[in-house]
Regions:
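Nucleotide-sugar donor-binding/catalytic module of glycosyltransferases
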Residues: 1-212, 252
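Charged/polar, solvent-exposed surface patches and flexible loops
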Residues: 47, 51, 103, 222, ...
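Short secondary-structure capping/turn micro-motifs that flank functional sites
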Residues: 199, 216, 240-241
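Membrane-proximal basic amphipathic "stem/tether" segments
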Residues: 225-260
Length: 260
């Protein structure tokens, strides 16, 4: 029975962390190792984590060098066959997510599994703001924004051991760099589940204003260049029409039902 290590990196996440924790603990798949890496929160995040401490395999709180450093700490401490990263603004759509993913790993014998996600407003978690369709990955459509949604990505730990962890000198695009490194350069095998597995609140680390937009494009360009992909500032803009389409697609998906 495959063990899945779910890692949550958090910092001052008192408003959202409980949804994240419960979405993991309520999974029907039971061979889950849950790891929480906190960046020395000063709000009530640690008190909330403590409520569920007996069901969490590992929970540490210490200063770190950012979210990607926290992710790396979690991966290093994990003992699972499969790694999943679920940030403290996000939560699984339902209790069957991990079970479905493990089933896909077993059936397809692949290195990774990913799916779609939806964005919701922090004050209205049932209302879809944008639908992100990951699509079947193809290096040719990379610059058009057709990449696996990182929060939905499950990867065998052996892949990280072979090809490395997240680059901590990136501020908000180390996830994009990781996807390029694994899917384009190393050509790992994958299976795409055409359904929503993760719900993400708007306003996360990588979605805070115009400065973040500029930084993300700059780091995305750097990630392409470091991995031998030809790209420029203009090619980085090709993904935005697809993002706009995601705004329209939300209407066809309706509202979400929550189980709490």
């Amino acid at each position: 029975m495959l063990k899945v290590s779910v890692i949550t990196a958090c910092f001052n996440s008192e408003k959202t962390i409980e949804d994240t924790i419960l979405s993991v603990l309520n999974q029907t798949y039971k061979n889950i190792e849950y790891i929480i890496i906190d960046g020395a929160s000063t709000d009530s995040t640690l008190e909330i984590i403590q409520k569920y401490r007996d069901k969490i395999a590992c929970a540490i709180s210490e200063k770190d060098k950012g979210i990607y450093d926290a992710m790396n700490k979690g991966i290093k401490r994990s003992s699972g066959d499969i790694i999943a990263l679920l940030n403290s603004d996000d939560f699984y759509k339902d209790e069957f997510v991990v079970e479905k993913v493990v089933h896909e790993f077993e059936n397809k014998n692949c290195d990774s599994v990913y799916a779609d996600l939806v964005f919701v407003k922090p004050d209205c978690l049932e209302k879809v703001v944008r639908y992100y369709e990951s699509g079947e990955f193809n290096p040719k459509t990379l610059l058009y924004g057709v990449v696996p949604a990182h929060p939905t990505l499950f990867v065998k730990k052996a892949i990280h051991e072979r090809y490395g962890l997240y680059k901590t000198d990136y501020k908000i695009s180390a996830d994009f760099e990781m996807i390029i490194r694994l899917f384009v350069v190393q050509k790992i095998s994958f299976s795409y589940l055409k359904e929503v597995l993760v719900i993400m609140r708007t306003g996360g680390v990588s979605a805070r204003g115009f400065k973040s937009l500029l930084l993300r494009n700059k780091e995305n360009l750097r990630a392409c260049q470091e991995n031998g992909i030809q790209a420029n500032v203009f090619s980085m803009l090709l993904k935005y029409p697809r993002k706009v389409m995601g705004l329209f697609k939300r209407g066809s998906k309706g509202s979400l039902k929550r189980n709490d």
